[in-house]
């Protein structure tokens, strides 16, 4: 494989890739509001000469290149989280800016930059006759990943394959274009969302001892979650310290897999509460 030719082709496409990425950044595309950006992606894929460009029932945009019974899939989720308080941004998140080193704006890294790389990467493969024989390249711009991770590919599997087993038999492997600082990561342990509910007894805030404050009870859980993520090996307990998953003493069956993937992480991402009023103990 001529890596110099690949680099030269990428350099030649750089202005077009930059424009494509900045166009995507300029289109607000929070989860469930991706219509504008998926249409822009479809336009680019068609202009690049993809054999087929289509949308599935959920709204994912899919570009196909090459011929064959086996598939190599490249996924980029193209929805973003919100911008929060725009005053906290150093530049308009939907205009952004570019320097010799970065392209700044909402979604530039997570993950519309990956979409630009995937779209042009497969185009370069076609230009240089690097498409593998017997394989189709499946380039996916997936939606609603930020809010409901996995639903986008569940839709694809159900619509284009006869269930998960059929998908596994036809898709040779999947490349995720999540940002990695240019590293190649060969595995992922997956993701889990856990909801924890705490209930208390409300009372007037002037006499909190008469109630049972659900916020205080939840605070203990939140601190334990923090400790679970942050405790070093020598500070781990039977509960706290995810680093223990790497130790055969505590994880004899799966520690080798854990070492390959690296230790897991966890965090608290949302808190909700109910209370009759701001002067009452939360229940």
Which role fits each region the language model picked out?
Residues 36, 83-85, 149-151, 185-186:
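Short glycine-/acidic-enriched loop or helix-start segments at secondary-structure transitions
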Residues 55-58, 142, 271:
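Conserved beta-strand termini and adjacent loop/short-helix elements that scaffold enzyme active sites
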Residues 87-95, 152-165, 190-194:
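A glycine- and small-aliphatic-rich helix-loop capping segment at beta-alpha/alpha-beta transitions
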Residues 160-283:
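Midchain, well-structured core segments that form catalytic/ion-binding scaffolds
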